[in-house]
Amino acid sequence: TKDYMAHQYVQQPNAIAANRIKRDFFNVRSDGTVYGLEPNYGCCTANMHQGFPKFTENLCYKTDEGFCFMVYSPCSISTLFKGVRVILNESTDYPFKNKSKIVVESVSGNPEIKFSFRVPQYTSLEVLVNGKKVVSGDKGIIAFKKKVEAGDVIELLFDMPLTTVVNPDKSISFRKGTL
């Protein structure tokens, strides 16, 4: 809920119940799937505020050669790169949609910048610059170098196939990309 008075300690894909019952979890009490302020243990309430700044500070790293995008989320980056002010804006609905767009909003001169991208697990990634494919890959980090100009558009296209997963209890889950 918006006031954080109802969350689950243990979330299960395709869960059909949120109740107090003995389960086969080795380290979770019987109320672990129940919604509340502090179900099972109070760590969520105590630590919830830490996630947002940690998530934000790990979206993109500046390197000696350019920028490395590690996590995909709407953001704006304004920094000096080799003495040149660079402003990048990312817009995306990833992982719910398969696209992300990074626009070079402002840059002085025409510096060569290396752009690196982490390929999320269970996906492959294709990168287009101004509509032309420049690199693709299905694991690790993929990268390209370009002399950038204001207005350049970098598009990330994530291929996220739908797969089925058989769980240890023989139930089946569906996975689409990282979801």
Regions flagged by a language model, labelled:
Residues 100, 140-144, 152:
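Short strand-edge motifs at loop-to-beta-strand transitions and within beta-strands
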